[in-house]
Amino acid sequence: MNLTFLIPVKLESEDRVRNLKTILTYLLTKFDAKVLVQEQDTTNRFTKLIMPYLTKRFGIISHRFQYFFDKQNTNYFHKTKILNDLLLKSDTEIVCNYDVDALFPETTYTNAYQAIKDNQCDVVYPYGCGIYQKAVTYKQETFDKFLNSDLDVQSLDKYATISNSTIGWCQFVRRENYIKSFMMNENF
């Protein structure tokens, strides 16, 4: 795939760490795409909390995965700036702005990617209709079981509830047009 996932992150909770491990495992296993992660915080937590897991799981993955740390003196998380930074570091035809709390069936990703590759559109928000989404709350045991399975997201349906679509951002974009459109607005 000529695709890079752009993932801004701040690892401020156990839940965020678990979410990041989940999506990195899923993306690196299911897709032949690049993944760029940029952590922005006062302290680098990724190297201690995520990297040992990735190294154990995947070995050397430097050809598809890159991590960047942006040290901040405050707790402010400037997501739009991080996305712009990652966009400029990417080198693929298509990028995907990706939150750590979004996970879809594999076909959702491939359909969104293919729609852009086939020049049907320049941007895809790979969501269903309406203002609701599935929200999955799970215990560590469920998390471990999912990561050691075939990563079929439908296996998580039994833990899902329907909730308002207020979290979980994902946006596939043709990189060249994204840059031409002046990227993300960093002023808010």
Identify the role of each PLM range:
Residues 46-89:
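Active-site-proximal specificity loops/subdomain of glycosyltransferases
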Residues 105-186:
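Conserved catalytic core of nucleotide-sugar-dependent glycosyltransferases
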Residues 14-16, 42-50:
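Short, charged/polar "capping" segments at the starts of alpha-helices
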Residues 22-26, 81, 85, 111-112:
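Alpha-helical elements of Rossmann-like donor-binding domains used by nucleotide-donor carbohydrate transfer enzymes
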Residues 93-103:
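Short beta-strand-to-loop acidic/aromatic patch adjacent to the donor-nucleotide binding site
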Residues 1-26:
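N-proximal low-complexity "stem/linker" segments adjacent to membrane-targeting elements
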Residues 32-44, 68-72:
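Short beta-strand/loop segment that forms part of the nucleotide-sugar
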